[in-house]
Amino acid sequence: MDFPSTLRPSLFMAGPLGMTDGPDLSFMCSWRDALTLPGAQPQNCRDQTSSFAKNLLWEPSTPGPLPLVPPGPDPWDPGLAAQDFLFRGGHYYQYQSRVVLDVTEQLSRFLWDHGDIAFAPLGKLMLENFRLEGNRGYSKKVTIVSVKRLLQDLGGHQPWGCPWASLSRRLRRFSILGGPVLSRSVSLLMGRLLHEELATRWEQLLMDEAFTGGALAWLPGRTARAGQLVYPSGGALDKLYFQEVSVNSGGNPRVLEDPGHIQLRGPVRQVVTSTVQGETLLAVRSDYHCAVWKIDKQEPPAPLQVLQVEKGATGISLSPHLSGELAICSRSGTVCLWTPQDGLQTIYKDPETLAFRDPSPWRWADFTAHPRVLTVGDRTGVKMVDIQGPPGCGLLLFCAGAEAACQKGERVLLAQYLGQPGPASTSLHLICTQFSIYLMDERLPLVPMLKWDHGLPSAPLLARLLPPASPGYPRPLLLGGQGGQVQLLHIAGEGTSIPQLAGPPQSLPSITDSLSAFPLLEPKRQQQLQERLEAPVIGLAAAPPCASAPGLLLFQLSAAGDVFYQHLRIQQTSSLREPDHPAPERPASRAAAPPVDQGSTPSWTSRASARCSRWLEALMELSPTNPVWAAPTFSHRRFLGHMERQKSQETLAQKLQAAMAKGQLLRPGDLGTLPKAEPPPAPQCSQQDELTERLTKAWEGQAAAWWKRHQDQTSGSQRQSKRPKRRTQLSSTFSSFTSYMDSPDASSAPHSQDLSNSEACPQPPRTPPSQELTQELWAQGVQHERRQTLRDYMAKLPLQDNPGPVATPPSQTSSRQTRSFRQQTPVLSGSHPPRKKPRMGF
């Protein structure tokens, strides 16, 4: 482990080397006097960096990641959003914008939905004033209330539903007795605890530090094109899956068989793998447990040790030097080292932060290039600790402050050693904050070798350094944010050379960019799919490139347990230019602009769309229906078992009549169980209805032509339907007159028959035949609704004086009936005087 041959003053750059005019030496802390003035960079270094920046580009084969395995059987809850925490009212006298948590609504909902949990501890305090059995107790000093009647009143009380719900005297007495206890003790205690929980949830919503380091790992297999993915899944992420994956010549992965899994007692937060001297180990961190397995390619994983962390584990790492060595750090500031030979030993303990005070209990530990030196980090900085030295001995490697030109409020989020297991180990460490990344050399503490503002909108908690695609190529560094954003950086410089960025970073597509590959769904299902794709990313892994598969295969794990993959390949124009052939010198620009992709834009293939469709079908089959909310009920059957509920024999109608007669207010408990109404049948939509045809024509752009044709058809059908109706009415009227005038004996036969019958036996008075004939003729010209009224009116008219009918010539009869039709008034035969025109509307 030698120092670099030359220490240039351009160790710290505002951007990648070769993309800026000169170094930024606005700060150099204690090294300012030791370093010389800035000098010109060597031509070969500038040319080689420029060739990296111009030629090395990775392009994705698809516009977004694709699902690798089907979704898990357990449902996934997206959790609470920002609008669920914030206060939605107005803020008066507020001079600066700040986040206000809505504790009042959350507390009221908690007391209403979980009253048994909130008020159960207060039972002993209120026991002396309440009696569970029997009637109310009489005492001059202590007021005792019967719980049976009280719960019966509470069972029908609806403070939020019915505005006319009346309060009984027992409820008022209960409010007086329990007011001091319920209003003060519960509200103060629960309010304080709930506010702490809301503050913790709000911090987790902004940045969930539990998945720092990532919960996804790639284990190399027997060949370069095969491997194994280790990741958690399930509703609680408590199942550790081992999935065999093979990579074909085109770079697409293929799942070999059903994955094996291990059931754990807690959620998996971090997965770390390491291969030392041919032995592969797997370490898993949960909230309060850590475990180590030995991985064999032919046998199932064998557990080595399970450790319990009382204060909660925050970080775990495997040694790249010694097989089986494990470093664990907890929230109490303790760092422990576990080995198969010596067991567990404490190497560092400090509850305080390194540089300045910070309330975060997060701690981190990792190894260095020296086997007996570890790094211990918190939000304020990173410190190197010698295990063999005295307690508290160490050297500060990084400090979040003016030494590193940090911004206000900038904190350390991840500290990772970039060395790989093997003889060619490096001394570089990656420090990630919410604004920038730093490359630190442990041989030069407190002096950043490289700084870059990553610009990620979410916290970068995931980082993976991969081997180069070919000899002489820079090493790709993957930087992942919790929101799903992934950046690809190229780190050049090994051994004694200075580390540098070979070109600006590349932003890779996120999981949410794959939404366009899925088929369009109804709005509710589309929202479920979008929420699933927007789940936070908790794992990042990659299959390293090799000679047989030069492409890069990137895997991402979401909080829902879904694994997505994306294939990256180097562009055909990307190649390294030898430093012996310098490029023409060009003026460097201040701002490092992102490269412009000269290649073709990737598009979705039919194979990718089919894979997304199959994954979506499996997801829709597993999506559960939302539970129907039901109002809470009060029951006293648990502690009042001997009291049976009274069953009323009265029907619902009788109860309603009695309540209306007395003027009482009915409660839901008085009516009993109401019958549930069956949902109406869903309307069956025909495929050939008018609306479907209209929408189809509108979608094809022929809405105007369809509407004109529809108007022509409607008007034509109306004209055709009106003309036959009018002709039918007129023809029936004239045909009735003609048929009656052509038959002169139509009225004589019935008259003679009626006369003979009347002489034989007495009969009640009837309507004369002429009147019946007149009624039938009238009924032909009157609407169907008024025919019965017309018959009743004709039946009420007086009969003739002579019992026998008077013969009337057919001509007079027809003229009389025609005149009656015109006047719409019946004309009777006989010597009766003419009647006035009736005023009944006929």
Curated annotation (Swiss-Prot):
Its main location: nucleus. The keyword Ubl conjugation does not apply. Residues 809-826 have a biased composition (Low complexity). It is found in: Nucleus, Nucleolus. Gene3D superfamilies: YVTN repeat-like/Quinoprotein amine dehydrogenase. Residues 574-605, 667-690, 702-842 are annotated as: Disordered. Transmembrane segments: none annotated. Keywords: DNA-binding, Nucleus, Phosphoprotein, Transcription, Transcription regulation. One of its GO terms (cellular component) is fibrillar center. Residues 577-588, 783-794 have a biased composition (Basic and acidic residues). GO terms for molecular function: RNA polymerase I core promoter sequence-specific DNA binding; RNA polymerase I general transcription initiation factor activity. Residues 833-842 have a biased composition (Basic residues). The modification Phosphothreonine is found at T808. The keyword ATP-binding does not apply. Signal peptide: none annotated. Residues 745-760 have a biased composition (Polar residues). Component of the transcription factor SL1/TIF-IB complex, which is involved in the assembly of the PIC (pre-initiation complex) during RNA polymerase I-dependent transcription. The rate of PIC formation probably is primarily dependent on the rate of association of SL1/TIF-IB with the rDNA promoter. SL1/TIF-IB is involved in stabilization of nucleolar transcription factor 1/UBTF on rDNA. Formation of SL1/TIF-IB excludes the association of TBP with TFIID subunits. Recruits RNA polymerase I to the rRNA gene promoter via interaction with RRN3. Component of the transcription factor SL1/TIF-IB complex, composed of TBP and at least TAF1A, TAF1B, TAF1C and TAF1D. In the complex interacts directly with TBP, TAF1A and TAF1B. Interaction of the SL1/TIF-IB subunits with TBP excludes interaction of TBP with the transcription factor IID (TFIID) subunits. Interacts with MYC and RRN3. Interacts with p53/TP53; the interaction prevents the association of SL1/TIF-IB with UBTF and represses RNA polymerase I transcription. This is TATA box-binding protein-associated factor, RNA polymerase I, subunit C. The gene is Taf1c.
